[in-house]
Amino acid sequence: MMSSAVCRLAPSPTGAQHLGNARTFLIAYWSARAQNARLILRIEDIDSPRIKPWATEQAITDLRWLGMDWDGDPIVQTERSPLYDEARNQLMDADRVYPCSCTRRDIEAAASAPHESEASGWTPDAPVYPGTCASWKNGDPLPEDKPFCFRFRMQATPDRFFDRVHGEVACNPIQDIGDFPITRKAESAADCLAAYQLAVVVDDIDAGVTEVVRGDDLILSTFRQLQLYEALGHSPPSHAHVPLVTGTDGRRLAKRHGDTRLSHFREQGMPPETIVRWAAKSSGLCPDSDAALSERTLDQIHQQMIDRFDWVRIHRQPTVVDDFGSTTD
């Protein structure tokens, strides 16, 4: 019997899915099935300038190749603009957003260089906005002479949440993050299309998502989204930020680390069981000493991980990959 929990797989078709993506999706999948949750597939294609036309179909193929399934048809962000516009208007009425015509160069020139916050230990993931346009109030005229986006007003109250992998995490939202854009730039409000931060919150609210699983490079994004949930009048889901898969240089996987695309391994004839076994062991869900894992079928491996699933088993440290194809069983 399906529970009331709702989880999601949310690939972004900005390129090929790689080993790091696979492990995060597998952990999310095992957690969802362990809860008997409804699992949705959402295609996060809102960042249209970076979207690759072939990447959506390939991502779905990759997920199915690894033995994952989901409930219902895929949800596609680019088909949901009216929902995002409605949420933006709600935020405007509450004076939680304002138009901003600053360029990235303007922001970098006005803001101090990214630094480690003495208050919380975070290194900002983008230049902290200095508030140049923040004096705008709802009802003031919109900019007419240059493109603008809508920027969300962060509240100064210190933010914290419990992460299922890392425990309690906290930040100073003004010092570590600052006001952030919820739309892309355009010449008019009607043409300001939703950006990632707003879209994912609206989508999760609409689907009733109760658990979000993603890489721990997105923890600062979670602080942004927690304030969006509050401003839109909804309680947030629980969060689990899993460690990244990195190269030997400590940086997350990229082309410089060799070809770690799932499609590459599939084309080379690697069985999906190899990747799923690696994800099970490297995540901490399955001990390295479990030699019997190599004898199990794909469905059997999935069922074992679903039966064993517990967030306390998930490692907190990144997994380093070096020449994956030659080091796996």
UniProtKB/Swiss-Prot annotation:
<feature type="binding site">
    <location>
        <position position="214"/>
    </location>
    <ligand>
        <name>L-glutamate</name>
    </ligand>
</feature>
<protein>
    <recommendedName>
        <fullName>Glutamyl-Q tRNA(Asp) synthetase</fullName>
        <ecNumber>6.1.1.-</ecNumber>
    </recommendedName>
</protein>
<keyword id="KW-0547">Nucleotide-binding</keyword>
<feature type="short sequence motif" description="'HIGH' region">
    <location>
        <begin position="11"/>
        <end position="21"/>
    </location>
</feature>
<keyword id="KW-0479">Metal-binding</keyword>
<dbReference type="Pfam" id="PF00749">
    <property type="entry name" value="tRNA-synt_1c"/>
</dbReference>
<feature type="binding site">
    <location>
        <position position="100"/>
    </location>
    <ligand>
        <name>Zn(2+)</name>
    </ligand>
</feature>
<keyword id="KW-0862">Zinc</keyword>
<keyword id="KW-0436">Ligase</keyword>
<comment type="function">
    <text>Catalyzes the tRNA-independent activation of glutamate in presence of ATP and the subsequent transfer of glutamate onto a tRNA(Asp). Glutamate is transferred on the 2-amino-5-(4,5-dihydroxy-2-cyclopenten-1-yl) moiety of the queuosine in the wobble position of the QUC anticodon.</text>
</comment>
<dbReference type="InterPro" id="IPR020058">
    <property type="entry name" value="Glu/Gln-tRNA-synth_Ib_cat-dom"/>
</dbReference>
<dbReference type="GO" id="GO:0004818">
    <property type="term" value="F:glutamate-tRNA ligase activity"/>
</dbReference>
<keyword id="KW-0067">ATP-binding</keyword>
<feature type="binding site">
    <location>
        <position position="255"/>
    </location>
    <ligand>
        <name>ATP</name>
    </ligand>
</feature>
<feature type="binding site">
    <location>
        <position position="44"/>
    </location>
    <ligand>
        <name>L-glutamate</name>
    </ligand>
</feature>
<feature type="binding site">
    <location>
        <position position="196"/>
    </location>
    <ligand>
        <name>L-glutamate</name>
    </ligand>
</feature>
<dbReference type="InterPro" id="IPR022380">
    <property type="entry name" value="Glu-Q_tRNA(Asp)_Synthase"/>
</dbReference>
<comment type="similarity">
    <text>Belongs to the class-I aminoacyl-tRNA synthetase family. GluQ subfamily.</text>
</comment>
<dbReference type="InterPro" id="IPR000924">
    <property type="entry name" value="Glu/Gln-tRNA-synth"/>
</dbReference>
<dbReference type="GO" id="GO:0008270">
    <property type="term" value="F:zinc ion binding"/>
</dbReference>
<feature type="binding site">
    <location>
        <position position="102"/>
    </location>
    <ligand>
        <name>Zn(2+)</name>
    </ligand>
</feature>
<dbReference type="InterPro" id="IPR014729">
    <property type="entry name" value="Rossmann-like_a/b/a_fold"/>
</dbReference>
<feature type="binding site">
    <location>
        <begin position="8"/>
        <end position="12"/>
    </location>
    <ligand>
        <name>L-glutamate</name>
    </ligand>
</feature>
<dbReference type="GO" id="GO:0005829">
    <property type="term" value="C:cytosol"/>
</dbReference>
<dbReference type="InterPro" id="IPR049940">
    <property type="entry name" value="GluQ/Sye"/>
</dbReference>
<feature type="binding site">
    <location>
        <position position="133"/>
    </location>
    <ligand>
        <name>Zn(2+)</name>
    </ligand>
</feature>
<dbReference type="GO" id="GO:0006400">
    <property type="term" value="P:tRNA modification"/>
</dbReference>
<feature type="short sequence motif" description="'KMSKS' region">
    <location>
        <begin position="252"/>
        <end position="256"/>
    </location>
</feature>
<feature type="binding site">
    <location>
        <position position="129"/>
    </location>
    <ligand>
        <name>Zn(2+)</name>
    </ligand>
</feature>
<keyword id="KW-0030">Aminoacyl-tRNA synthetase</keyword>
<dbReference type="GO" id="GO:0005524">
    <property type="term" value="F:ATP binding"/>
</dbReference>
<dbReference type="GO" id="GO:0006424">
    <property type="term" value="P:glutamyl-tRNA aminoacylation"/>
</dbReference>
